[in-house]
Amino acid sequence: MGQTLDESRPLGKYLFVGYAKGRAKRRDILDQATALFGEAGYRGTSLREIAARCGISHPGLLHHFPTKESLLLAVLAHRDEVDQERVTAGHPSGAAALRRLVGIVALNATRRGIVELFTVLSAEATAADHPAHEYFVDRYSRIVRELEVAYAEAREAGDLRPGIEPARAARDLVALMDGLQIQWLLGDPALDMAAAVEEHLKSQLLS
């Protein structure tokens, strides 16, 4: 039988507080690494810079993340987990799943650091020796596949305009969103990413 911490006892309370502090520090490291990777890219950021931003020593950072690669992958996994929860909440399908993306794009417009992170790293990761290369290959494959399923479901429900092929539509939508993010990061003042995605989907969906 497993043991649990008794917070009413001194040792249990000490361990509980210690674990909580460790989790909080780990979260702070992930947040600061996200910002720095977004500003300078993976190759342009050092662990010492991240440690300094967090107010801890280099060995202190290595206690939580022994390598720069492990930190990068933890940052990416954390962001994916958060965003995936938003996308799949309520288990939408078909046209509803596609329209859910408008809200995600609107949210991204309030998270410049996250958009910078993925834009910079996805460009860097085109190099086969980049530690996030496989991650981004898998991520794009998964996103395109999920969108293709959503378009196919919309077609089966009679919600997709004639002549639209799900596989192509999925890739076009990913390309549109990525392109909009780059233009937005470059400072286009007239660009409303969410509105552009919404208009694109309206041109494809019947309901």
Name each region found by the language model:
Residues 117-119, 164-183, 196-203:
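Hydrophobic alpha-helical segments that form the core
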